[in-house]
Regions:
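Conserved alpha-helical segments that form or flank metal/cofactor-binding pockets of metalloenzymes
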Residues: 118-133
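Glycine/tryptophan-enriched, flexible segments
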Residues: 1-115, 124-125
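Active-site-adjacent "gating/activation" loops or surface patches in catalytic cores
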Residues: 132-176
Length: 180
Protein backbone atom coordinates (compact mmCIF):
# COMPACT_ATOMS: atom_id res chain seq x y z
CA UNK A 1 0.00 0.00 0.00
CA UNK A 2 1.12 3.53 -0.76
CA UNK A 3 2.18 5.54 2.26
CA UNK A 4 0.96 9.01 3.09
CA UNK A 5 3.34 11.73 1.94
CA UNK A 6 4.46 14.16 4.62
CA UNK A 7 5.39 17.49 3.16
CA UNK A 8 8.48 18.79 4.99
CA UNK A 9 7.84 21.94 6.99
CA UNK A 10 10.20 24.91 6.75
CA UNK A 11 12.49 23.71 9.55
CA UNK A 12 12.69 20.18 8.10
CA UNK A 13 13.42 21.55 4.65
CA UNK A 14 16.24 23.74 5.99
CA UNK A 15 17.64 20.77 7.95
CA UNK A 16 17.55 18.66 4.78
CA UNK A 17 19.63 21.30 2.98
CA UNK A 18 22.12 21.33 5.89
CA UNK A 19 22.35 17.52 5.86
CA UNK A 20 22.94 17.49 2.10
CA UNK A 21 25.73 20.05 2.45
CA UNK A 22 27.38 18.70 5.62
CA UNK A 23 26.87 14.95 5.14
CA UNK A 24 26.77 14.23 1.40
CA UNK A 25 27.80 10.58 1.94
CA UNK A 26 25.16 9.81 4.59
CA UNK A 27 22.63 7.04 4.11
CA UNK A 28 19.30 7.86 2.55
CA UNK A 29 18.27 9.96 -0.41
CA UNK A 30 16.64 13.20 0.71
CA UNK A 31 14.28 12.98 -2.26
CA UNK A 32 12.75 9.98 -0.43
CA UNK A 33 12.45 11.82 2.91
CA UNK A 34 9.01 11.09 4.32
CA UNK A 35 9.42 11.06 8.08
CA UNK A 36 7.60 12.87 10.86
CA UNK A 37 9.62 15.47 12.73
CA UNK A 38 7.16 16.32 15.51
CA UNK A 39 4.87 14.52 17.99
CA UNK A 40 1.66 15.35 16.15
CA UNK A 41 2.82 13.93 12.82
CA UNK A 42 4.29 10.84 14.53
CA UNK A 43 0.98 10.23 16.35
CA UNK A 44 -0.87 10.63 13.05
CA UNK A 45 1.40 8.05 11.43
CA UNK A 46 0.80 5.65 14.33
CA UNK A 47 -2.95 6.10 13.83
CA UNK A 48 -2.55 5.64 10.07
CA UNK A 49 -0.61 2.41 10.63
CA UNK A 50 -3.29 1.09 12.95
CA UNK A 51 -6.04 2.04 10.50
CA UNK A 52 -4.49 0.93 7.20
CA UNK A 53 -1.71 -1.60 7.85
CA UNK A 54 -2.20 -3.20 11.27
CA UNK A 55 -4.68 -5.84 10.09
CA UNK A 56 -2.07 -7.35 7.75
CA UNK A 57 0.97 -6.67 9.93
CA UNK A 58 1.07 -10.15 11.47
CA UNK A 59 1.00 -11.98 8.15
CA UNK A 60 3.70 -9.80 6.61
CA UNK A 61 5.87 -8.65 9.56
CA UNK A 62 8.75 -10.88 8.47
CA UNK A 63 8.16 -10.62 4.73
CA UNK A 64 10.57 -8.86 2.40
CA UNK A 65 9.83 -7.66 -1.11
CA UNK A 66 12.36 -5.73 -3.16
CA UNK A 67 9.51 -4.04 -5.05
CA UNK A 68 7.68 -2.89 -1.92
CA UNK A 69 10.12 -1.64 0.70
CA UNK A 70 7.64 -0.80 3.44
CA UNK A 71 4.82 -3.31 2.88
CA UNK A 72 2.82 -3.49 6.13
CA UNK A 73 5.70 -2.50 8.43
CA UNK A 74 4.82 0.12 11.03
CA UNK A 75 7.80 2.44 10.30
CA UNK A 76 7.55 3.63 13.90
CA UNK A 77 11.09 2.85 15.12
CA UNK A 78 12.55 6.31 14.39
CA UNK A 79 9.76 7.90 16.43
CA UNK A 80 10.20 5.48 19.32
CA UNK A 81 13.99 5.95 19.21
CA UNK A 82 13.75 9.75 19.18
CA UNK A 83 10.99 10.06 21.78
CA UNK A 84 8.34 11.33 19.36
CA UNK A 85 6.30 8.25 20.30
CA UNK A 86 6.11 6.39 23.58
CA UNK A 87 6.17 2.55 23.49
CA UNK A 88 3.39 2.26 26.07
CA UNK A 89 1.12 4.54 24.02
CA UNK A 90 1.75 2.49 20.88
CA UNK A 91 0.95 -0.75 22.68
CA UNK A 92 -2.21 0.62 24.31
CA UNK A 93 -3.49 2.01 21.00
CA UNK A 94 -2.78 -1.34 19.30
CA UNK A 95 -4.67 -3.22 22.02
CA UNK A 96 -7.57 -0.79 21.80
CA UNK A 97 -7.75 -1.13 18.01
CA UNK A 98 -7.63 -4.92 18.30
CA UNK A 99 -10.43 -5.16 20.88
CA UNK A 100 -12.64 -2.67 19.00
CA UNK A 101 -12.23 -4.71 15.80
CA UNK A 102 -14.14 -7.64 17.36
CA UNK A 103 -12.01 -10.23 15.61
CA UNK A 104 -11.40 -8.42 12.33
CA UNK A 105 -7.75 -7.82 13.22
CA UNK A 106 -6.01 -11.19 13.59
CA UNK A 107 -4.27 -12.07 16.83
CA UNK A 108 -0.96 -12.50 14.99
CA UNK A 109 -1.03 -8.80 14.10
CA UNK A 110 -1.54 -7.51 17.62
CA UNK A 111 0.76 -10.12 19.18
CA UNK A 112 3.46 -9.51 16.58
CA UNK A 113 3.33 -5.74 16.96
CA UNK A 114 3.36 -5.80 20.77
CA UNK A 115 6.15 -8.41 20.80
CA UNK A 116 8.26 -6.27 18.46
CA UNK A 117 7.78 -3.11 20.54
CA UNK A 118 7.87 -4.53 24.06
CA UNK A 119 9.43 -7.95 23.77
CA UNK A 120 12.20 -7.09 21.36
CA UNK A 121 12.77 -3.35 21.02
CA UNK A 122 12.51 -2.50 24.70
CA UNK A 123 14.43 -5.65 25.73
CA UNK A 124 17.35 -4.84 23.42
CA UNK A 125 17.29 -1.22 24.59
CA UNK A 126 17.71 -2.57 28.13
CA UNK A 127 20.62 -4.77 27.01
CA UNK A 128 22.33 -1.73 25.50
CA UNK A 129 21.75 0.43 28.57
CA UNK A 130 23.03 -2.30 30.87
CA UNK A 131 26.15 -3.15 28.86
CA UNK A 132 27.34 0.07 27.25
CA UNK A 133 29.93 1.28 26.50
CA UNK A 134 31.81 -2.06 26.60
CA UNK A 135 29.09 -3.74 24.49
CA UNK A 136 29.83 -1.41 21.58
CA UNK A 137 33.33 -2.85 21.12
CA UNK A 138 32.61 -6.56 21.67
CA UNK A 139 33.76 -8.79 18.84
CA UNK A 140 32.86 -12.36 19.78
CA UNK A 141 34.36 -13.91 16.63
CA UNK A 142 37.44 -11.64 16.67
CA UNK A 143 36.90 -10.61 13.06
CA UNK A 144 39.37 -8.02 11.82
CA UNK A 145 38.76 -7.85 8.05
CA UNK A 146 37.34 -4.67 6.58
CA UNK A 147 34.18 -4.83 4.46
CA UNK A 148 34.72 -4.13 0.77
CA UNK A 149 32.59 -1.71 -1.29
CA UNK A 150 30.10 -4.47 -2.21
CA UNK A 151 28.79 -4.23 1.34
CA UNK A 152 28.14 -0.52 0.93
CA UNK A 153 26.84 -0.57 -2.65
CA UNK A 154 24.60 -3.64 -2.44
CA UNK A 155 26.58 -5.72 -4.91
CA UNK A 156 27.54 -8.74 -2.78
CA UNK A 157 25.70 -11.16 -5.06
CA UNK A 158 23.34 -12.16 -2.23
CA UNK A 159 19.96 -10.78 -3.42
CA UNK A 160 18.20 -10.20 -0.06
CA UNK A 161 21.34 -8.63 1.41
CA UNK A 162 21.88 -6.45 -1.67
CA UNK A 163 18.23 -5.34 -1.55
CA UNK A 164 18.57 -4.41 2.13
CA UNK A 165 21.75 -2.43 1.47
CA UNK A 166 20.18 -0.58 -1.47
CA UNK A 167 17.08 0.24 0.58
CA UNK A 168 19.30 1.58 3.36
CA UNK A 169 21.10 3.72 0.81
CA UNK A 170 17.82 5.00 -0.66
CA UNK A 171 15.68 5.40 2.46
CA UNK A 172 18.07 5.20 5.46
CA UNK A 173 15.68 2.45 6.54
CA UNK A 174 15.72 -1.34 6.57
CA UNK A 175 12.84 -3.46 7.88
CA UNK A 176 13.64 -5.60 10.91
CA UNK A 177 12.81 -8.67 8.80
CA UNK A 178 16.13 -8.25 6.96
CA UNK A 179 17.98 -8.65 10.24
CA UNK A 180 16.53 -12.05 11.21
Amino acid sequence: PKRKYLKPNKISFEAMIDVEECYPQSFGNLENFNWATNHEDAENLLDDFLERYFENYGSFQDAINKDNTFMFHSLLSPYLNSGLLDPETCIKKAEEKYFKSKGKIPINSVEGFIRQVLGWREFIKGVYWENMPKYKNLNFWSHKSKLNNNWYEGTTGIPPLDDAIKESNDYAYTPVSYTH
